[in-house]
């Protein structure tokens, strides 16, 4: 018995439908595999580029800085951040740092105000299943007011807690996927007056083979002012 459907027999229609479904499933499977590979590779590349960009940004801030704050602390979202050196543990690293950068006007003259810039780690805004305990590097920026060329602001008088809680402070996430203990700030103040800050960053990638799971880079920043 023949069953015609627009010129096709029932058998031919079933065969055509099977071939169509097979081709469709194959295309979808290939697309999903390629998408997964592409996502993993791009994520890895972007994280490294993001980290390099963040470290260069930090280095630029420290080069322009006139003051590196030491022995300070502040509270952000219920967590206390200690800026080294800790009075209780001299020489120990911290997980935050802040500097004061003089504001220069369009004529290249100091305005008397400062940009207070700092960095710290906090939990990820969007947790990643591959790195559930990962942290993100945050940069905060605040501009002082009221300073003049004749009567400039004293950067050492700035209260970092006030800076953190001010509505005028901008917070920017510069790097994601940093291990909880993967970033350390160490501030040195030798007799010759050169202040330096050493940063160590380490990240584990759960989506790479064990031998490649750890990305570690050291960065040494110096301020000669």
Placement of each model-derived feature along the sequence:
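N-terminal secretory signal peptides that target proteins for export/translocation
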Residues: 1-3
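Low-complexity, S/T/G/P-rich flexible repeat/linker segments used as non-globular hinges
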Residues: 144-150, 202-225
């Amino acid at each position: 018995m023949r069953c015609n459907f627009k010129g096709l027999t029932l058998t031919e229609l079933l065969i055509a439908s099977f071939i169509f479904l097979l081709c469709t499933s194959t295309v979808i499977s290939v697309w999903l595999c390629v998408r997964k590979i592409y996502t993993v590779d791009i994520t890895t590349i972007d994280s490294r580029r993001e980290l390099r960009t963040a470290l260069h940004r930090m280095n630029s801030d420290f080069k322009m800085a006139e003051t590196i704050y030491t022995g300070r602390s502040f509270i952000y979202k219920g967590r206390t951040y200690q800026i080294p050196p800790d009075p209780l543990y001299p020489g120990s690293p911290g997980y935050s740092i802040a500097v004061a950068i003089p504001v220069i006007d369009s004529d290249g003259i100091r305005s008397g105000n400062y940009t207070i810039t700092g960095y710290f780690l906090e939990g990820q805004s969007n947790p990643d299943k591959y790195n559930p305990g990962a942290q993100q590097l945050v940069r905060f920026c605040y501009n002082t007011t009221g300073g003049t060329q004749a009567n400039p602001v004293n950067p050492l008088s700035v209260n970092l807690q006030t800076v953190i809680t001010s509505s005028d402070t901008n917070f920017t996430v510069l790097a994601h996927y940093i291990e909880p203990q993967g970033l350390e700030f160490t501030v040195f103040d030798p007799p010759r007056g050169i202040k330096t800050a050493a940063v160590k960053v380490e990240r584990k990638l759960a989506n790479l083979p064990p031998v490649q799971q750890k990305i570690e880079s050291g960065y040494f920043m110096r301020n000669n002012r």
